[in-house]
Amino acid sequence: MLRSIWGAALVAAGVFWAADVRAATPAAASASYALPAAAADDAARLDAAMPALARQLLADARDDGRDLNQRFRLQLVAGDYAAAERSLEALSASATQGPVPVRPNLAQYRLYARAKRLQTQQGLDFDQALSRAFAELVTTMDDRSAGVAMRVLNFEAADLPRQQRALAAALAPLRTQAALDRDAALALVRSYQVERSYAAMAPRLPALTAADDARRYAIQRDVAVATPDGATVCATIVRQRNAPQRQPTLLNFTIYADPVTTLNEARRSASNGYVGVTGTSRGKACSPDRPVPYEHDGDDAAALIDWIAAQPWSDGRVGMYGGSYEGFTQWAAAKRRPKALKALMPSVTGAPGLDVPMEGGIFYGFQYYWPLYSAGNRGLDTAAMEDGARWDRMYRQWYLSGRPYRELPQIDGTPNPFYLRWLSHPDYDAYWQAMIPYRDEFAALDLPVLTTTGYYDGAQIGALYYLREHYLYRPQAEHYLVIGPYSHISGQRGTGATGDSLRGYQLDPQAQIDIGELRYQWFDYVFKGAPKPALLADRINYQVMGANVWKHAPSLAAMAQRRQRFYFGAQAGGDGRYAFLARAAASDDYAEQVVDLRDRSDAERIVPGGGIVDPELDTALSAVFVSEPFARAQEFSGLFSGQLEVGTNKRDFDFNISLYELMPDRRYFELSRYQSRASYVDDVSRRRLLEPGRRTVLNFEAGRATSKRMQAGSRLVAVVSVLRNPQQQINYGSGKPVAAESVADAGEPMRVRWYGGSYLEIPLSD
């Protein structure tokens, strides 16, 4: 049912490759491209057939050669290596228009193209050709350029198996059809080009990159640092060989103990004139302890910071950076206030107990297997993370069986003590509060902070939680926000990692930024007296989708000129949808939803929609409210809020409100959403059950901001859903702990009434 939780988790974890192949024009898409069926299972036949396919696609191109990203791949597969080099050189020299321009990092393909040209033209074997190409292209780079290039030249262990699976998937249609359409053929060429390039270079590159590193840097791996309570954390330390005796240090502290990534992070900081340090959670890398997510990272990161400050190469100043879990570790360390910690740059930062592993008190499904991936051993269990069939099967079985949520480990057959521990803390209680700054602890945090996140980042709630609490308890805080149409990946790495489109939305040129480059602009400002990054013109810096501009405001509230109320109508139209009203309906009028929580007839349902821009919406188990068309263009910027007057026959229910712009062309544009368990709307630290049959008022403010220029003639649409799906907990409304409820607690169908006094308040500007 619904979209696979596996797909959502891959996006969150950054497993998908950026979508490089753009849609073909209708004329081109009508062409067909034949390959022998045997090529799907015979590598030699595939290698023999692919050059001709690439040449045919090049001959049929309709872009006049302007799509260099597509063109160089076709040229590589066609064997025209000199032309591929020219395309790659032109593409690498390009830059986006945004305030922190993105420059494509294609060093791995430039290296491969040069090596193949040398091999072909000079009769060298590939090892010799690759070594010479490396000397010509990489050895000659300055440290900063090489530090960026090394991020794509140091392959992770999971890269090649992942590419092999992608190639197999692209080949699968050949077993059942005689020809591919242009889009499928382009996708096949891309998968083939990536897999063959990496497979050729993977055995040879480690020695080349290690020699280059040894020439440029002093590198210490697996440095064991003792913590005050007797545990061990592991560090990787990189310093330029020609660096000053003492420098500020940039620390990335992570549970993701991948040796390639940890070195890449530390090396890039060193290449920018800092001591680069990557620390890993206790129990990871060289630490002999047992890994435990979240609980010790604040103390351990603070201990590592104290250790760094005492080293002869440290000038006593440490900055922290990183995204997702690595954003959490920054705030966890700041809670302990180590003296040497002077600045933060947290990106797409989760807040344990608030938006991870649950949101609004509702536990997410995709978080179930994350601890098996991240804390199952000293490294990472990529096989568990990428076993989508296993997790889809587990959740389907759970959904159909109606068993309690806490029995997921029994259904899967593998213990998951961390997830069960989290389930035992559904309130935002002392367990969670001990992890990150809480309330007036923010008042003591006098260090400068730059937060980055995205409108479509699953961790935006956490990122904005830290920002809002910092402002609340320390109004003078030097804390900046950069936010735009970014995902969990692009919100920490920039759009170079994901491309110029996101889930069907073509990004404005101004939205395309390099957050890695912004990182060093930020720390150079803090530590080296450089100018403040130009993008940080005010505290809140946001990209207005559809307007191709950045705007700047002193607060989240100041993003909009006014707040307009949209009241829930009570009478459904002929299409089953309700109107948004300018004034409240009669107080006793209501729109009612009836949901049988025992029903599983939708277990195989294919969910419509899913794009940021999409012709369809998923309206199952939902009431849909639609406004009148806007007479003129409106800008929706900021956080929406609402007051819900509700009644139900249960003691609790889970709900979601998703907002869309219904554009004049009848497509929907995803704006923002809010999700919560009704009993936690007022206070996430204490569950307050509802009284069946009695009207209740729920006041909320969403945690996800957005900014979109809505067209004249557009309408605002709200999809208000009562939640029942296999992707997260099901709240049966009995009032028992939800993790212990089963379908036996469902009783009669749930009835939820949205009374006429209910409204959403939208931040708007003309």
Task: Write out the residue ranges for each language-model feature.
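Accessory cap/linker subdomain of secreted extracellular hydrolases
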Residues: 146-197, 203, 208-211, 271, ...
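N-terminal cap/lid segment of alpha/beta-hydrolase-fold proteins
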Residues: 203-245, 630-632
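Cap/lid segment of the alpha/beta-hydrolase catalytic domain
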Residues: 240-309, 494-506, 651, 657, ...
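Alpha/beta-hydrolase fold nucleophile elbow
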Residues: 312-325
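A catalytic-pocket lid/entrance helix-loop region that shapes and gates access to the active site
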Residues: 321, 328-392, 455, 474-520
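C-terminal, loop-rich substrate-recognition/catalytic regions characterized by aromatic stacking residues
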Residues: 399-403, 496-766
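Short beta-strand/loop motif that positions the catalytic acidic residue
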Residues: 445, 451-453
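Conserved alpha/beta-hydrolase "acid-adjacent" motif
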Residues: 458-464
